[in-house]
Swiss-Prot record:
EC identifiers of the protein: 2.4.1.21
CDD domains assigned: GT5_Glycogen_synthase_DULL1-like (cd03791)
Matching NCBIfam families: glgA, PRK00654.2-4
Residues annotated for ADP-alpha-D-glucose binding in this entry: K15
The protein's name: Glycogen synthase
UniProt superkingdom: Bacteria
Catalytic activity, reaction form: [(1->4)-alpha-D-glucosyl](n) + ADP-alpha-D-glucose = [(1->4)-alpha-D-glucosyl](n+1) + ADP + H(+)
Keyword hit for Iron: no
PANTHER family, sorted: GLYCOGEN SYNTHASE 2-RELATED, PTHR46083
Pfam families linked to this entry: Glyco_transf_5, Glycos_transf_1
Keyword Protease: no
Organism of provenance: Protochlamydia amoebophila (strain UWE25)
Function recorded in the entry: Synthesizes alpha-1,4-glucan chains using ADP-glucose.
Pathway annotation: Glycan biosynthesis; glycogen biosynthesis
Length: 500
């Protein structure tokens, strides 16, 4: 099949969150399985261009309509991780993607409306006829109504549209007249059955448009797909998702084991694998390798070399991620004879300031270290050198960090929500087979909830080493590669392609 993904992010060159990793991982797996896969993203001035090979101009002066005028664009083509990627560079006086950032501009909505119209115009003008156009999140959701109501009428009819929702919190709400910028009649779409926002009827909801107009809709875990049908997690779109439940499914994200793998990880000072894991108490070879990385991590972050577990946390510092719980656990972990490492940053100035104050408070603390900027090397060291990994999210569509932690033999402590509930089975769960248990789970998003899970984990680490070793083994054995997830997508691609 020929599949084109249109997205706002792509790892490793334009990454803000998990969306970038998902687009790369899924596309690589589809390509490895013999499918023709292309990707279209904006040509950001701040992306890591060194990750692009053989970048050349593919379409010079592509015209695209915006706000009553036609503007030229240059479309570049290059190769990223052996995938063909098209980069759209607008020649618009507002320099939509020359801002030194991926998101966070006041006119983000207009930037991605422009990108969406231009991406579709490129496919149409070049007569590129894929079987599937796969859209991601609100930034490209408007392509679905654009395609169905404009480009199909121009004779561009072959592709089917699949739309993936990565996070219901971000929906792309705008005024009806904003759709006029890209040639759609905004007033026409301000109807409940089209794109009218369910909570604020004077607004248009781009995410809703993606749901209504796509041939199929997915989200990033089976449990999150159930949760978003409820008012709590549906964020106002639960009724729309219930209405279109016949074309809606949750597919768990995978991770790329060619990158996240302690056996071959280029960032680690030593390597270890499941095959080398100890079979009994006397066999300490691999534990010693993980312990060696733990020692290096402590030295790098000036933590005390004591018989204590390290609890790691790698996250964006936004309310969704349970930042109040993270702040609370710092002291609790130390009181329970643990050490805590945080790697994260926040796009929200008040939260960023708050954590910088905490960092100052814990300067030179022998058991606490906060890193408030991204470091890929440190991320890998923390996954490998930690004993436990906390993910206290208030909601979590899928979550990748807990899956990565499992591969590194680092036991997750998570809240039971979204994809965390799909991937982590509590060690004390009575209805699960012993080899399926791989972590600690709590329900209530409060201090008592997370404290109880941390206490159980730390107690096991100190008092039940054989049980702890088995938890590590169980996690490392689990397969969350893209192989199975990509097969689920392929079945949907094939099913919707077969429909007239």
């Amino acid at each position: 099949m020929h599949i084109i993904h249109i997205a706002s992010e792509l790892a490793p060159l334009a990454k803000v969150g998990g969306l970038a990793d998902v687009v790369l991982g899924l596309c690589r797996e589809l390509s490895w399985k013999g499918h023709d896969v292309d990707i279209i993203i904006p040509k950001y001035d701040c992306m890591d261009s060194e990750q692009i090979r053989d970048l050349t101009v593919d379409y010079f002066e592509l015209p695209s309509f915006y706000n009553g005028e036609w503007f030229f664009n240059t479309v570049w083509m290059g190769w990223v991780e052996n995938l063909k990627v098209y980069f759209i560079e607008p020649h618009h006086p507002r320099f939509f993607f020359n801002r030194g950032c991926f998101y966070g501009c006041e006119d983000d909505l207009e930037r991605f409306l422009y990108f969406s119209r231009t991406a579709l115009e490129f496919l149409y003008k070049k007569s590129i006829l894929p079987d599937i156009i796969h859209l991601h999140d609100w930034q490209t959701a408007v392509i679905a109504p654009l395609y169905k109501d404009m480009y199909q009428k121009l004779g561009y009819t072959k592709p089917k549209i699949l739309f993936t929702i990565h996070n219901m919190e971000y929906q792309g709400k705008c005024a009806a007249h904003d759709l006029n910028y890209i040639g759609l009649d905004g007033n026409r779409y301000q109807q409940h059955s089209f794109m009218q926002d369910n909570l604020y009827p004077h607004l248009i909801n781009l995410l809703k448009g993606g749901i209504v107009y796509s041939d199929f809709v997915t989200t990033v875990s089976p449990n999150y797909a159930k949760e978003v049908l409820t008012p709590k997690e549906g964020r106002g779109l639960e009724a729309t998702l219930v209405e279109y439940q016949h074309k809606f499914k949750g597919i768990l994200n995978g991770i790329d084991y060619s990158y996240w793998n302690p056996e071959i990880d280029r960032f680690l000072p030593a390597h270890y694998s499941l095959r080398e894991m100890p079979k009994n108490k006397k066999d300490r070879n691999t534990v010693d390798k993980k312990g060696f990385i733990k020692k290096i991590l402590r030295e790098k972050l000036y933590l005390a070399e004591e018989h204590r577990p390290i609890i790691g946390c790698i996250t964006r510092l936004v309310p969704q991620k349970g930042i109040d719980l993270i702040k609370h656990t710092i002291r609790h972990i130390v009181e329970k004879k643990g050490q805590f490492i945080l790697l994260g940053s926040s796009p929200i100035p008040s939260i960023n300031d708050e954590f910088h104050r905490l960092k100052h408070q814990y300067t030179d603390h022998p058991h606490i270290h906060l890193i408030l900027h991204h470091s890929e090397e440190l991320a890998h060291l923390i996954y490998a050198g930690s004993d436990m990994f906390i993910v206290p999210s208030l909601f979590e569509p899928c979550g990748l960090t807990q899956i990565i932690a499992l591969k590194y033999g680092t036991v997750p402590i998570v809240r039971r929500t979204g994809g965390l509930a799909d991937t982590i089975i509590d060690v004390d769960h009575t209805d699960q087979q012993p080899d399926k248990k791989n972590g600690y789970v709590f329900d209530d998003p409060d201090a008592n909830g997370i404290d109880s899970a941390i206490d159980r984990a730390i107690h096991c680490w100190f008092e039940e080493p054989e049980k702890w070793r088995q938890l590590m083994l169980n996690g490392m054995k689990m397969d969350f590669s893209w192989n199975q997830s990509s097969d689920c997508y392929l079945k949907i691609y094939q099913a919707i392609s077969a429909k007239n």
